[in-house]
């Protein structure tokens, strides 16, 4: 496992995930009967600051169909959490107009690279082009100076 699991922190994330799904109208419990489901959800809502009991609630009451999605969400959140600790791994976001994103995504796909790798490559290409233009300009000036002296 690449990222360390922090039980207390992740229990809080699981609690928030389940509460969010409940508020969005998803069935978060394994119970078909409405009163049993409501009772289990009410219990969950009281467990915000009790990580051990949140995990026990998940084992006992959670809808099994939700388990995989929750694991994926927590795994992604764990990755973002640990990547945010270091400047070089911290993710940044930029706003792009749809057409710009579409063109960039197409270019990245054709090159078989990620969006970030494609952007870096485009920047490097532009820098090389600037260097080349500067060298050509200097060469041209030197050549004109040589020809002008004769």
UniProtKB/Swiss-Prot annotation:
<dbReference type="InterPro" id="IPR009390">
    <property type="entry name" value="MatP"/>
</dbReference>
<comment type="function">
    <text>Required for spatial organization of the terminus region of the chromosome (Ter macrodomain) during the cell cycle. Prevents early segregation of duplicated Ter macrodomains during cell division. Binds specifically to matS, which is a 13 bp signature motif repeated within the Ter macrodomain.</text>
</comment>
<comment type="similarity">
    <text>Belongs to the MatP family.</text>
</comment>
<keyword id="KW-0963">Cytoplasm</keyword>
<dbReference type="Pfam" id="PF17414">
    <property type="entry name" value="MatP_C"/>
</dbReference>
<dbReference type="Pfam" id="PF06303">
    <property type="entry name" value="MatP"/>
</dbReference>
<comment type="subunit">
    <text>Homodimer.</text>
</comment>
<dbReference type="InterPro" id="IPR013321">
    <property type="entry name" value="Arc_rbn_hlx_hlx"/>
</dbReference>
<dbReference type="GO" id="GO:0051301">
    <property type="term" value="P:cell division"/>
</dbReference>
<dbReference type="InterPro" id="IPR035375">
    <property type="entry name" value="MatP_C"/>
</dbReference>
<dbReference type="InterPro" id="IPR035087">
    <property type="entry name" value="MatP_N"/>
</dbReference>
<dbReference type="GO" id="GO:0043565">
    <property type="term" value="F:sequence-specific DNA binding"/>
</dbReference>
<keyword id="KW-0131">Cell cycle</keyword>
<keyword id="KW-0238">DNA-binding</keyword>
<dbReference type="GO" id="GO:0005737">
    <property type="term" value="C:cytoplasm"/>
</dbReference>
<dbReference type="InterPro" id="IPR038339">
    <property type="entry name" value="MatP_N_sf"/>
</dbReference>
<keyword id="KW-0132">Cell division</keyword>
<dbReference type="GO" id="GO:0006355">
    <property type="term" value="P:regulation of DNA-templated transcription"/>
</dbReference>
<protein>
    <recommendedName>
        <fullName>Macrodomain Ter protein</fullName>
    </recommendedName>
</protein>
């Amino acid at each position: 496992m690449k990222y360390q699991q922090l039980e207390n922190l992740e229990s809080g994330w699981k609690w928030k995930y389940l509460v969010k799904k409940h508020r969005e109208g998803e069935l978060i419990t394994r119970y078909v009967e409405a009163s049993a489901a409501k009772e289990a959800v009410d219990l969950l809502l009281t467990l915000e600051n009790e990580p051990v009991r949140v995990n026990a609630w998940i084992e006992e009451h959670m809808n099994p169909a939700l388990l995989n999605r929750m694991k994926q969400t927590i795994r992604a959140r764990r990755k973002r959490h640990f990547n945010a600790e270091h400047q070089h791994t911290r993710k940044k976001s930029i706003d792009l107009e749809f057409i710009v994103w579409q063109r960039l995504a197409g270019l990245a796909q054709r090159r078989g690279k990620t969006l970030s790798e494609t952007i870096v490559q485009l920047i490097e290409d532009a820098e090389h082009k600037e260097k080349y233009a500067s060298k050509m300009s200097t060469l041209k000036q030197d050549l004109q100076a040589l020809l002008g002296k004769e």
